Amino acid sequence: MAEVNEPLQIELRKIRNSSTAGVINEFDVIVSAVEGTLKEQKTEATPTAYLVALLTLVKEFTDLKKNFKGHTFQLLELVIKYVPSNVLQAKFPQILSVLAPVVNNAETNKTVLLPYLNVLEKLLLLQDYSSWTHGNSCKTSIYILLFFALSNTEKTRVRSLQILANILKNPPAGPVTEHPAIKYTAFEPLRLLESLATAKKPKTPAEVQKLNNSLVLIRVLCSSTHWPMTLVERLCRSCVLIVGQRSTNSILLVYQILDGLSKKSVDYTDAVSLRMTLICLQKLEPSEHDPILMVGWLKAMNTAIRAFNILDKETAKYECLHRFKAFFTLLESESMEIRLQTATTICSVIGCLDTTPNSFAVVEEICSFICDALRDIRFRLAYPECFQIISSLCDKLGPHSDPYLIPALEVIDYLRGSEGFDGKALVDEAIGSFVRAIGPEAMLRVLPLNLELNDKDAVGRAWLLPVLRDNIRFANLAHFTNYFVPLSGQLYQKVIEMNDLDSIPSKLLQTLVDQIWSLLPGYCYLPLDLQSSFTLEFASILVNVLYEQVSLRSVICNSLTALVETNSKVADKLPLDDVISVPVSASDASSNLAFLTNMSSNFLSVLLNVFSSTPSQYRYPILKCIQTWIFISSNDTIHSVYKKVTDLLPDSLNDLAGSFNIAADGISSPMAYSLIDLLIVISPYLNQDYAVTLFEYVHEFLRHVNPAIQKKGYKLLGTLLRVDYGKAYATQHVKEIFEELSSVADRVVSSTRKDRLASLNALYELQSSELVIAIPQLLPEAIISLKEVNEKARHTAFQLLFNIAKSAVNSVEFGNSKPERVEKFVSVISAGLAGSSTHMISATIIAISSIVMEYKVFISEPFLVQLISTLNLFITSSKREIAKAAIDFIKISVSSFPVECIKPLLPELIPNLLAWSHEGKANLRVKVRHLFEKMGRKYGIAEIEPFFPAEDKKLITNIRKTQERNIRKRAMKRDPAKPSSAQPRKTFASAYEAAVYDTDDEAEEEFENDEMNNGNGGDLRMDEAFVQEDNDEEPLDLLDIEAVSKISSTDPRKKLAARKQKLNSAFKSNEEGRLLINDSDEDELIEDSLANAQQHAEVNRTYLEAVAGKESFRRGLNNRVKFSNKRVRDDYDEEMEEVEVPEVTRKPAKQKFDRKQRGQKGY
């Protein structure tokens, strides 16, 4: 008899091996009965056969025991996922004939209904268009879902709504885009709504609940698909009647329904329905004194206006803009929610504007409203919203904001200059919108800076410079050259004329000069007049600034970089950052690049000189600028730069020979360092004619005595191996390159390790067959590098190991088939297990784990069993580093490989693992416990418990009870009616790290469930209450008279957390920062006493330090209090730590205080 398919087999095994009492037995009984029936009938155990057998059980639903009913449908939900779609589609009427009668059974509860509804969803999603339009099966199923969607049972009601929404959002392929079921799906709820809306007598609570349920159902339908046009008028009429009944919840649901109608009208271009919706909304405007209803109405109006602007722009402009005044008066409200939503709605109204004269008349009226509001005390609270509206107007009108919005700009400037005005940040954002819209030149005509100080009565606006800096783009570069360059010169001249350069006026003027030049990157962001404004005169000014003002070099270089990058992106038709449209065409940008190319030679010469004279910590902007300009330079220019660098390089290397001096901060590094950095930047833009020379330089650099030169040599090699001509040369000379790298292996130091690994990785990415024979020679270095402290070096080592494995797996040198090659490669790695050092052995185990995870589908079961048995021996190692790596490998094996591979080895694995469960240091003890928990979930507690000796039975008993308790908690917390909000899983650098360091499945599931439940808020108007329970296992008895004392309006968990933090200070901690808690009550009392004593001692020490310590006060003449201003060196010394720096020409930097490292030592 054929077996069921593997995924279904795994799922069935999981539920049958579940360790929870009650659940496991019933699932096992049902599955065993089904399989026994299939064997008796000599039927193949396919998913379809399971489905038929389970449907037979469903026919006998009334005869089943209560617990078996829910489990039968859960199994049915599981099995139906693996049944072929064509079978479910063809046999849907027969399946439904079995499922439909279950609805009428009085004993049906949520344990049955939830999987029942899931089965129904699966069946309906598979039906084609003809099934929906012909026959009654689909219609019957929809009526079943509508029945539960209107029920009072929350979980089944919400799940039914989710299923209906999912079905309507996924219509079958057919002649129309909307779902064919929407007609009868919408008709029944609407008919019920009309009957409830027209009822004149007061409604009972049950009728109110039914009304709200029907409104929620219609809201789901409207937001999922297009409401039938023939029913829109009837729905709007019912909405008007319901709003007249003045039920807050019902009115909010009405607004949400109309909001959904507006959204879907856009998707289906139904302007008629949208017009009826907007008319209905205008009739249903609530009182401005009701914030809840007003916010809901404004949201619906906002959606309707935006939809109208998409479908019918002309009508929207005239029908929506006349409501601006009515909307604007709502900004007087004291409710912040109303003001915020009003501003959003007004911005949508502004979106209906265009650049025609009629719109400009409306803009002038809107601007007048805003100016009057900013002067009116009634709108004092609405200033932020007014600024938001002004910004929206500027973004919509663009350059046309001048002159129509200039009055608003003047009012804003007046407000910012007022004393006591506290909204300057918001004003700056609004003014920034004006800068982006009309440009800096027009802005400064309205609001001049007045920095010349020619007119004593003029108001200075130095605060405007940072606003300009952050918002200038697509401007005229001529404005900077004609206005700001002379202004900067005047201010700088005043600085020079001052005698004291350290005086406050001098520093203020220098700050203004720096702020003026900080505007240049904005002016260089795709300027409109580049070719006419970027003259030789302006270029000479930039060169002088680069040479003379060191503090402005980064600004100038960033400007030159932006000039090239923005034009390059536009020329290549790539989007600019956060910019939808640009005012420069691709052809104009290409012309600009050609213009800049003619100037690149001169600029590169200057930049090379400046680069060599700049301290290393300030070089990055210059180096990036050089790289950017080389990109657009001609081949002759690139060759000229290359020749300059290489001509100076030999002498500079000779000057550096035998020198290990490290340049201090603020001092330029040796010339050789600068030249090699430039060579690395230039090399990607050269061609194959330079390949031989460049690789000769690599040879020379790698053999240099200076480690910094070696590091740069590896960087140059890595760069060459990633460009086309370098790859071509390396492919032909791969053997020589590898021999060169092998010959300098003994010269490698920690600072060059990462770059060497990157070069080797780039070499193996070529996948040359000549490198296969070198694998045994390179593997030890790659393996030991897996234990590098530097994270980037460690990740590069993993990449190198995988590339080596890829070469081996693709080579016939390791076997004839892929499984054989993988196993042989793992065997080659296993040679490292015989290493003499702890590091090498643990690194080898990590390497084996990584390769096994990467190629697990090719590894045979016998080889895997042998591998696990071998590494099992290392679990008992006395070296924690080795044991940890071996335990991680076992964890990977348990997680990734079939049960049959691991189960036979449990008698050997578990005793060895238990040896570490008694470890005093908690790291391995917790790791082993988590591994046992994972085994218990996968194999079942009953399978692993026999291998626990008597003295360790307590551990497995605790694990079993913990799992059962977690299952009960999740069962109580799980709410299928609420949508899942699972957190995104953390990503890792490799499959090995994902398997070893990822969160435990069960713990993650608990976390996600807790997050889901904690995130679901109740009624926003209801005060929050907290219940404090003494025992987690026994829920609070609310009928008890003492229950009142357990309910609080404040969260008791905060006090409990503070109390725990206080108690935790009494416990000892191990080297990993974990608390060590003794089981003895006496020890706890001793620890508490010690904690109290330490607390009192700390108070006393602090007091004595305050009155008699180094920083205490003294009394001087006339009994005045004096404090010492001397800095005590001992108080400020920080621990030095080695850090990897890009270049050894810098001093080792002082490391900042590292709390994570030093926190383990009691700091």
Curated annotation (Swiss-Prot):
GO MF terms, alphabetically ordered: RNA binding
Subcellular location: Nucleus; Cytoplasm, Cytoskeleton, Microtubule organizing center, Spindle pole body
Transmembrane segments annotated in the record for this chain: none
Gene3D superfamilies in UniProt: Leucine-rich Repeat Variant
Skewed-composition ranges (Acidic residues): 1131-1141
Region span, Disordered: 1127-1163
Keyword Nucleus: yes
A GO term from the CC aspect: cytoplasm
Family of the protein in this entry: Belongs to the RRP12 family.
Matching PANTHER family: ARM REPEAT SUPERFAMILY PROTEIN
Biological role: Required for nuclear export of the ribosomal subunits. Required for maturation of the RNA components of pre-ribosomes.
Record's protein name: Putative ribosomal RNA-processing protein 12
Organism: Schizosaccharomyces pombe (strain 972 / ATCC 24843)
The encoding gene: rrp12
